[in-house]
Amino acid sequence: MKKNHKKLWKVLTIVFAAILVFCIVADVVTNYFFTSVNAFLLADTYKIVDDGVDGDTDYFPDEWAGYDEWFSYYEEDLCARTEAEGAVLLKNENAALPLGNGAKVSLFSHSSVEMIYGGTGSGSVNTSTAPNLRKALESAGAEINTTLWSFYNTGSGASYKRKVPALSSCAAKGDYSINDVPWSLIEKEAGLTDTFASFGDAAIFVLARSGGEGLDLAMTACTDEGTNGDYLALSTNEKDTLKALKALKENGTFKKIVVLLNSSNAVNCGFLDDPEYGIDAALWIGGVGAYGNNAVAGILTGSINPSGRLVDTYLKDNAYNPSLVNFADCTYPNAAEMGLTETNDDLQTNVNYVVYQEGIYVGYKYFETRYEDKVMGNGNPGDYDYAAQVYRTFGYGQSYTDFAYSDFKVTENSERFTVSVAVTNKGTVPGKHVVEIFMQKPYTDYDKQHGIEKASVELAGFAKTKQLNANQSEIVTIDVPKELMKSYDANGAGTYIVDAGDYYLTVGTDAHNAVNNILAAKGYTVENGMDEAGSAAMTFKYTQKDQDNKTYSVSAATGKSIGNLFDNADLNRYAASETKVTYLSRNDWTGTYPTATTVVRVTVQMAKDIANEYVPQTHDENGNPYVMPTYNANNGMTLAMMMGLPYDDPAWEKLLDQMSFAEQEDIVINAFHNTKAANSISKPATVETNGPQGITDSFFGGKKSGTAYPAEVIMAATWNRDIMTELGGNIGTQGLKTHTNGVYAPAANIHRNAYCGRNYEYFSEDAFLSGAMMAPEVKAIQDKGVYVFMKHFALNDQETHRAGVMVWANEQAIREAYLAAYAPSVTESHAKGAMTIMNRIGTEWGGACRSLLTDLLRGEWGFDGIVITDYSSNSNFTVQTQGLEGGADLWDGFRASDISAKQNDPYIANLLRQAIHRILYVQVNSSAMNGISSTARVVPITTWWQMTEYCATALFGVLTAACAVMWIASKKKEKKNA
């Protein structure tokens, strides 16, 4: 009798059915995440068919094509040069640095073998080929204590690693922990301390702190002993190591102690001058990028003279920053009562807020202004002690040589001041020097009456000299636009004004030196409380006779009138608010200084505004009814035909008429690191990716990975716009080589304090410096055909609760301290993209804020590019209809459409068409069109991975069915034979 295989067929049926179900589910899921899967697998979704001849279609050629190896060398060199000009020498007692060639050194802390190269999250970088500090120093001629290195790298000290929160679904989870090696373990390691004397020219201690996307640095929750919860303070293990190194220096084992600050966030710096630690020199190196360690080694050994200047105020203790009591985790006390909730694991919050109570007084603008008022006896400064709080001010940086100024001159015309000064290298070491020009505006009775604030000094211009040899001089000339004299008057004129009174310009070695120069020009001396004498000879006074409310009340870029746009972000002007904010004011420092979190209670109207229900519109602003646009026309147009035509050329209407509603919708709402192809107009798909330090990660669709440059904060610290142009050009070339058409960078959010998780990704605490450094980078990237998305526009200055946190600030601060960082990239460099914020401005999501995206960005600044949201899949408030109304064009994410149900709504249909017009206008003039002629057709194809899925589904469907048939047949046969 033949054996019955019923059980076998049953098992096979179940197994194949399970695989079939898996294939079906995989097919559904991968097609839902179609964009991301294509990006990850580098899959083509279309092919180009071109039967005609249209000349050269390499519109943006790769000038390094065929020379990839040489380009890599150039990238390495530029990375090192950026670090060389950005690293800041903070301290150098008795010329402890440079160490000289052949120095024998010992590297301390686990961070010496595991340095910070960038940040985490969207700005993470590929540093797989980066030379470590040991290799860099050895290449520079130093000898390294390899026994100590091995102890940290692979020995008993290797398990002591930093803990940094990991980014998951746009929210970082985990703890910040320093976790450095205890000194007791070093002492216990057999023979380790015996090696120190042989490598005793210097003990180099690396202090590293990491930041990243999704979570701010811990102010009270750091788990390391001795920090009191402050991640930017020294841990007990670090303190013990530094104390032990001092003891070893005192007994002659080490000659000097050098600290490297490997952090883009300003640490508490009081310890650097604490005699308990005996530190001789300190060098801030930030996030060094892939090859920045080569420059760090050059600075330490002396082949490079540091010329970087601080872009933030470095405090002895960051607790002195006035913003900290209103930072990170603030919750409306009556949120639950008003029906507001926090949902989706902090990926969507309706209950959190932050008040920028410090107003314009960010960073040095607070510390220097209160210092000046203390000296002059103005504004009730109280017992303020500048020297006890500030370690190094904005713009500070030492050199291995000395520079001197002479022949300071200022001329002026109706548009600008022109400042010139001679800079002479008075030392023996060749070096570069940064010339910094600061302006002081008068603080008038009108200002006090109308709530206008003025900092004692504001950066107004800068330039870096060439390399100057001993006794060599250079005359540096800097233009200062008179527009910088303006201040925003929200409560009086409702526009920009120029106050009557005395304005000062001065050249200063840093912000504090600038204040002292102006105080000297006013007749003050050290006898009045100045901590050092200033130079009146380095100042210029200009007197504005009358208050001017007209000159800057109209946009120079567009001719539009400028007026209040952000009343609803200021709790003192927002009609629904019952909270009054006492903003920090130099009219009464002691009485207005923030001492506790500003408590904000939600009103009924505020709760309604937070809900922000969509209200359909039927007529435009002129009273004309909206009508449905044309779809699916056959006009014979292709996108390539529009190349070079103005945005308002009539031909655009014919092109847009060819598209379907579905095509337009698919492009707009599914723009996670890409935009879809549009067959009706032969639009190719595009690839966009992150890139604050360069296009360094192929995860989202790049064909290769480029070099990771130093963090943006180091770029800014070069104070060298020529380097920014070089960096931008190289990032653009990276885009061409990786087939990346757009880059989510640069970013110009402000270092409101040292604890923002993404300070590494932003330039500075100062909006002027941020804007001046970002603009040339933007231009250079776009000159290569790669469009930028400057981000995060705007007021995304913390990571905690970033998905929905409500930012409350006054209009002067919003415009002067934050938005000003972005303006030059639009008005001068014509940025073609902006990425919005996840948070809210007042109660309104930034991606739907018409005041920001339409009235200011497009209306005042003349922006004609694409606005894309930040990642929007997790938050229900990132409503597409409202975003289109506000001025957003693309949604970075994948989620169900809010637009489909309104495809017959002429208002929404026209907004969608407007968004597509903007997108196409940018992309047709970009590298996305390389290889596509006006006669080319984009033909959709099934991707290889889809074909694989379809075949697998079909195969296991057939196998399941066949096995099921055999199983049933076996059962019947068994019954028959029973």
Where in this protein do the model-derived segments appear?
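Terminal connector regions
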Residues: 482-558
